[in-house]
């Protein structure tokens, strides 16, 4: 297994798909990476040479991925909470942030139903 950005990516998959195992890289980004580095998206990772893997590692090192990206997202949410803005309050109360209805649905965000106290 090749190790890129601290993640073991599978050898037996296409490069385009294998790169999506890295947090912060989806299909579109991985396709763009392959295009910029001159690596075929359909090539299997096990068929790539060490030089090609180094080029991929260098290109990914320029991006914000994995732990840095997770930290950045958490800091953005913390900033919203500290500001006390509407979105921050929604995060704080574990409610949907982007305007979805909450009278019905939103169970994933709100958690299991709580019994009504009389």
UniProtKB/Swiss-Prot annotation:
Keyword Ribonucleoprotein among record annotations: yes
Database matches in Pfam families: Ribosomal_S13 (PF00416)
Highest taxon listed in the record's lineage: Bacteria
GO terms, molecular function: rRNA binding; structural constituent of ribosome; tRNA binding
Region described as Disordered: 91-118
SUPFAM superfamilies according to UniProt: S13-like H2TH domain
Coiled coil: none
Example GO biological process: translation
GO cellular component: cytosol; small ribosomal subunit
Alphabetical UniProt keywords: Ribonucleoprotein, Ribosomal protein, RNA-binding, rRNA-binding, tRNA-binding
Disulfide bond annotation, renumbered to this chain: none
Self-association state and partner proteins as the record states: Part of the 30S ribosomal subunit. Forms a loose heterodimer with protein S19. Forms two bridges to the 50S subunit in the 70S ribosome.
Family matches, as PANTHER family: 30S RIBOSOMAL PROTEIN S13/40S RIBOSOMAL PROTEIN S18, SMALL RIBOSOMAL SUBUNIT PROTEIN US13M
UniProt function note: Located at the top of the head of the 30S subunit, it contacts several helices of the 16S rRNA. In the 70S ribosome it contacts the 23S rRNA (bridge B1a) and protein L5 of the 50S subunit (bridge B1b), connecting the 2 subunits; these bridges are implicated in subunit movement. Contacts the tRNAs in the A and P-sites.
Family, similarity comment: Belongs to the universal ribosomal protein uS13 family.
Identification of the protein by name: Small ribosomal subunit protein uS13
């Amino acid at each position: 297994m090749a190790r890129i950005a601290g993640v073991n990516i599978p050898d037996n998959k296409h490069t385009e798909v294998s790169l999506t195992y890295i947090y912060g890289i989806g299909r579109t980004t991985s396709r763009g990476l392959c295009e910029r580095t001159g690596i075929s998206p359909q090539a299997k990772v096990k068929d790539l040479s060490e030089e090609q893997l180094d080029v991929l590692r260098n290109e990914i090192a320029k991006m914000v991925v994995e732990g840095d990206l997770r930290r950045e997202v958490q800091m953005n949410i913390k900033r919203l909470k500290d500001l006390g803005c509407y979105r921050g309050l929604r995060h704080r109360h574990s409610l949907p942030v982007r305007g979805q209805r909450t009278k019905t649905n939103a169970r994933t965000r709100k958690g299991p139903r709580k019994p009504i106290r009389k």
